[in-house]
Amino acid sequence: MCPGNWLWASMTFMARFSRGSSRSPVRTRGSLEEMPSVHHPFLNVFELERLLYTGKTACNHADEVWPGLYLGDQDMANNRRELRRLGITHVLNASHNRWRGTPEAYEGLGIRYLGVEAHDSPAFDMSIHFQTAADFIHRALSQPGGKILVHCAVGVSRSATLVLAYLMLYHHFTLVEAIKKVKDHRGITPNRGFLRQLLALDRRLRQGLEA
């Protein structure tokens, strides 16, 4: 379980015991390989939730989900000693606001900072930040020795959504492939609104490849 994530615990409980049927879209049985591919004609938010609640659900304050790319929480972002130990050169904060996250917080560490003022709400349009965030991550990982922490409050929804978008935009992963890749290392739960936006990105990218 992600540190301090009471919401994760309650949602996992509901996923396991609600509806009382093996047809529940968020059941926890089965392996990732049994999940539908992105080309499945009925792939939707509910199928993605099945995938998200299958397999690895644990996470630490930060987990390396791609070489040099750490997905984590606010506690890790505030831990200067650990950031220095990991060799973090860039921080992308997906929960930036006037009280949480400033470039000045990393003075003396040589860390470059990007803040995204996003709300963990299904109604929030995270897609407007997909390209900017992906570009920032790409620049961080392109420099010699570059390592980036992408975080929000808990590190499972807002920041995870931006990491998934990065893998899709820069590494041509399908959404399902991106989710599987991240879940090999960290449990994530983007909210339904973010999943819909990622599905829209996935369809747009696939249409571009097929054109």
Swiss-Prot record:
Tissues in which the protein is found: Brain and skeletal muscle. In the brain it is expressed ubiquitously except in the hippocampus.
Domain Tyrosine-protein phosphatase positions: 60-207
Annotated catalysed reactions: O-phospho-L-tyrosyl-[protein] + H2O = L-tyrosyl-[protein] + phosphate; O-phospho-L-seryl-[protein] + H2O = L-seryl-[protein] + phosphate; O-phospho-L-threonyl-[protein] + H2O = L-threonyl-[protein] + phosphate
SMART domains reported in the protein's UniProt record: DSPc
Primary residence: cytoplasm
Compartment(s): Cytoplasm; Nucleus; Golgi apparatus
GO molecular function term, any single one: p53 binding
Active site: 152 (phosphocysteine intermediate)
GO cellular component: cytoplasm; Golgi apparatus; mitochondrion; nucleoplasm; nucleus
GO biological process, one term: positive regulation of cell adhesion
Keywords: Cytoplasm, Golgi apparatus, Hydrolase, Nucleus, Protein phosphatase
EC assignment: 3.1.3.16, 3.1.3.48
Keyword Nucleus: yes
Pfam family, one: DSPc
Gene3D superfamilies: Protein tyrosine phosphatase superfamily
Protein family per UniProt: Belongs to the protein-tyrosine phosphatase family. Non-receptor class dual specificity subfamily.
Function: Inactivates MAPK1 and MAPK3 which leads to dephosphorylation of heat shock factor protein 4 and a reduction in its DNA-binding activity.
Complex and partners: Interacts with HSF4.
Name the record gives this protein: Dual specificity protein phosphatase 26
Species the sequence originates in: Mus musculus (Mouse)
